[in-house]
Amino acid sequence: MASSDSSYSRKFLLITFLPLSLACLAFLLQWRSGVNDSVTQWFDDNYPFPGMATVSEKRSLRSDSSCVSLLGQSRTQAFPYLRDLKLDHKPDLKPRICITTSTSAGLEQTLPWIFYHKVIGVETFYLFVEGTAASPNVSRVLETIPGVNVIYRTRELEEEQAKSRIWNETWLEKFFYKPCNYELFVKQNLNMEMAITMARDAGMDWILHLDTDELVHPSGTREYSLRNLLRDVPADVDEVIFTNYESSVERDDIKEPFTEVSMFKKNFKHLPREVYYGNYKEATRGNPNYFLTYANGKSAARIQDHLRPNGAHRWHNYKTYPNIKELDEAAILHYTYSKFSDLTSRRDRCGCKPTKKDVKRCFMLDFDRAAFIIASTSTSEEMLQWYRERVVWTDDNLILKLLRKGILTRIYAPMVIIQELREAGVFSSVVTSAHMSLSKNRSNSSTSSNY
């Protein structure tokens, strides 16, 4: 009887655990990519999503300033979540968001800027390019990126913009026919006006104007998503304002601000009044103002009839006064003067005389004026000393105090996203793909000419 019970028990256990064992085996095989299903078949590469890699898996940042190191090492396979670098946003993903910018930056700045904003939900980019950005080696790469529209400053463009109604409006007239920053400001508005038309024709829902040293920080949203943020905006709101935070660099040898800067000074609008005014002097550190440059943020506007730019930071409407909402948490991260070389690059773009009188004709902000004079009249050693005193944060005790007060804050999300994109080979793959496409076209052209 005991033998019979023992045999029965073994059979019962076998019948019970065999299906469970087979189910576990099937799960393990599928998890190890031994079996493909409708989900895993699209993500069969072994690259992690941004932020999933362990510390031991992360490679240290290279310290050299070459374009190759900044764009990352090339890989044969593209980042799986970008699927061959297309990052196509289907029209049914609402709202559809676009960004317009006027830039002369190189690929080491524009590629991280573009793909970061693609990750958080931006679909289309209108890049009005000049200088380095318009050079063949840069522009031909930008033109290969889906969703990126490259607009050159041609004679035809200037003739078209000369007909703009902006020239007859009073709200911008004080900036007309002045050099340097004033000229750029007018160009930005003319470009924004053209971008509105292109965005409407493309069926966009929202438009932002950003510089390529600015990143949207959609803090407080689900999945760190700009699309989710704008989707939740009430239907009667025409425009939302992002306050800006300003980069606070802790070294004078920053090469790639987006992945080397994590500390920012918060806008006074996101601070209690007593904290802001009580620590103003220490937070300013002898500079003309609380922020080195602008403090009025940037805004996003719904694409609608009669929309117009209202300076580089706002939008307006020719027919009605827009209903505007200020966002409580989301911000624009402004990486201003985050590299020592920014002093000379800004100087080289302007032909003003380095005098206190003339710089007022060329620059709107006090810090820009002071920086231009220093960069134009000082030795490299004097410039570096000035930069360390005015821009770089080196007092650990002061940093700790202002972090505790909430004036300074650490923000890591953009750094993580961009570094993971770089380590996945996204930026270098774009460059390689563009060069291969160019070589192929040249080869085909050469072959055709032989017949």
From Swiss-Prot:
Cite the GT92 domain residue spans from the record: 109-345
Give the record's GO biological process terms.
cell differentiation; cell division; cell wall organization; cellulose biosynthetic process; response to abscisic acid
**GO cellular component annotations of the record:** cytoplasm; extracellular region; plant-type cell wall; plasma membrane
Q: Which InterPro entries match?
A: Glyco_transf_92, KOBITO1-like
- Residues with an annotated glycan are N36, N137, N168, N441, N444
State where the protein is found.
Answer: Secreted, Cell wall; Cytoplasm; Cell membrane
Signal sequence interval, chain numbering: 1-23
What Enzyme Commission number(s) does the record list for this chain?
Answer: 2.4.1.-
Assigned keywords, A-Z: Cell cycle, Cell division, Cell membrane, Cell wall, Cell wall biogenesis/degradation, Cytoplasm, Developmental protein, Differentiation, Glycoprotein, Glycosyltransferase, Growth regulation, Membrane, Secreted, Signal, Transferase
EC supergroup of this enzyme: transferase
Provide the primary localization. secreted
This protein's source sits in the domain of life called: Eukaryota
GO MF terms held by the record: glycosyltransferase activity
- Function in brief: Involved in the coordination between cell elongation and cellulose synthesis by promoting the expression of genes involved in cell elongation and cellulose synthesis. Acts as a regulator of plasmodesmatal permeability. Maybe a glycosyltransferase.
Family in the record: Belongs to the glycosyltransferase 92 family.
Official protein name in the record: Glycosyltransferase-like At2g41451
Native organism: Arabidopsis thaliana (Mouse-ear cress)
